[in-house]
A protein has these predicted regions:
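Glycan-binding loop/region signatures in secreted carbohydrate-active enzymes
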Residues: 14, 19-109, 138
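Aromatic-rich peripheral "rim/lid" segments of glycoside hydrolase catalytic domains that contact
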Residues: 77, 109-112, 123-139
Length: 139
């Protein structure tokens, strides 16, 4: 959708499709009594869960999923692999993985729309197979 909207105003040969080499691990934990008391009188009071996240590179993200014993499934809406598992203190972890499968979809959009190229961030967060994949679509 974003690419289509951009191409209404910008020529394809001027558009770069940026892709991430990291993802976020989301953690939802029920708020403590103290946290609920602090939230009184604010919009946050209507939410029973505290949500936090941390950025993970591709390898570390896959390792966390494996350590949790979580099942990975393809989220066809997000075009990413997804996993969810229960942690301590009634917490729920959720992660949409950036990996070769999700990046291939993004790189395919670049090629299908004749975009100028791709940019990626953050170097060092990718797995070694990603560079062969990028070369397949950029060259």
């Amino acid at each position: 959708e974003g690419i289509e909207e951009t191409l209404r105003d910008v020529p394809a040969d001027k558009v770069i499709n940026a892709v991430p080499f990291y993802t976020r691990l989301w953690n939802e934990t029920p708020k403590t009594d103290e946290e609920r008391a602090e939230d009184q009188g604010t919009e946050a009071a209507s939410y029973s869960m505290k949500v936090t996240s941390e950025a993970l590179g591709m390898e570390e993200a896959a390792q966390r999923v494996s350590e949790a014993g979580a099942t990975v499934t393809w989220d066809d809406t997000a075009k990413q692999n997804y996993a969810e598992w229960q942690g301590d203190n009634d917490s729920t972890y959720r992660i949409w993985l950036e990996d070769a499968s999700s990046l291939e979809v993004k790189l395919g959009l670049m090629k299908d729309n004749n975009l100028a190229g791709t940019a990626a961030w953050k170097l060092g967060f990718e797995t070694s197979d990603i560079w062969d994949l990028i070369q397949k679509y950029v060259n």
